[in-house]
Amino acid sequence: MQLESLSTLNYRNLAPCTLSFPAGVTGVFGENGAGKTNLLEAAYLALTGLTDVTRLEQLVQSGEGEAYVRADLESGGSLSIQEVGLGRGRRQLKVDGVRVRAGDLPRGSAVWIRPEDSELVFGSPSGRRNFLDALLSRLSARYAQQLARYDRTVSQRNAALRSGEEWAMHVWDDALVKLGSDIMLFRRRALTRLSELAAEANEALGSRKPLVLGLSESTTPETYAHDLRSRRAEELARGSTATGPHRDDLTMTLGDFPATEYASRGEGRTIALALRRAELELLAERFGEKPVLLIDDFSAELDPTRRAFLLDLAASVPQAIVTGTEQAPGAALTLRAHAGRFTPEPEPVSAQVAVDEVGA
């Protein structure tokens, strides 16, 4: 997968632009607030159709009614154009001019590494669960469909609980058990390989403590129906479904202890990087080509080992876009970011300084 070019219009603080990207590493540098993160966010949206903002209006430039991003892609010798239009709380996706759903876009097209990924370790169970569900939904269209049906069923069952409709519970319970059991079994199977890859990456990052991923499940496929019945009175009182895969957690054991409770900040950053590399490798195994790698702020709070790991990872994929307040070494193209605009930098700043000093 290669991003040939990215176009944006009225997207956050970005000036209207069309940027071309070569194979290899593109480095984007500039001060904080210059638009570097927004550029990666736009690229990820155009490549995957996905965003984690709660309101789409947040992506539209202040004073404008609509925003637009477009990615020109090459994959397996074929060219395609993916477009995302944003406006009035709606997202419209097109591939080669034909409207599609997010699930119709290439699911293995991009991985985005961000400084806030440490929250996968230290944040809430819902954040870790969302990470796992998002990854598995990209690996399997069927998982994405089952998860969407399960979420709808939970919402409908919760409404029935709040209305005191105990007589209808057996209908919702049967649906939850079927859908939820499928989700739990798929998670277990996928987690075996994800844990292997994350452990390898954790070791490559220099950690002396083994990393093991697991699941903290509120129920099991074998006991799900019984657990729903046994907690019926509690659920009617609280008006929500208390057990099921929507309550589970992705666990991370570092050495002999839960990472969420005992890992240092540095160890947390290592685990987060290991998870993202595992994500990249899983997508590559599933779809037969490595995704475009997007790395935001490659030097942020990272020691030399983790920083070198990120840069080596960027160099190992066919294409990566790496941002930072300083230039990324070894980039095939370097762009300077300033006030939402991006201009090619002819040579590293350090080289220019050296030339100036010699001339002086």
From Swiss-Prot:
ATP binds at G30, E31, N32, G33, A34, G35, K36, T37. The keyword Nucleotide-binding applies. One of its GO terms (cellular component) is cytoplasm. GO terms for molecular function: ATP binding; single-stranded DNA binding. CDD domains: ABC_RecF (cd03242). GO terms for biological process: DNA replication; DNA synthesis involved in DNA repair; double-strand break repair; SOS response. InterPro entries: DNA-binding_RecF (IPR001238), DNA-binding_RecF_CS (IPR018078), P-loop_NTPase (IPR027417), RecF/RecN/SMC_N (IPR003395), RecF_2 (IPR042174). It is found in: Cytoplasm. Keywords: ATP-binding, Cytoplasm, DNA damage, DNA repair, DNA replication, DNA-binding, Nucleotide-binding, SOS response. Belongs to the RecF family. NCBIfam families: PRK14079.1, recf. The RecF protein is involved in DNA metabolism; it is required for DNA replication and normal SOS inducibility. RecF binds preferentially to single-stranded, linear DNA. It also seems to bind ATP. This is DNA replication and repair protein RecF. It comes from Deinococcus deserti (strain DSM 17065 / CIP 109153 / LMG 22923 / VCD115). The gene is recF.
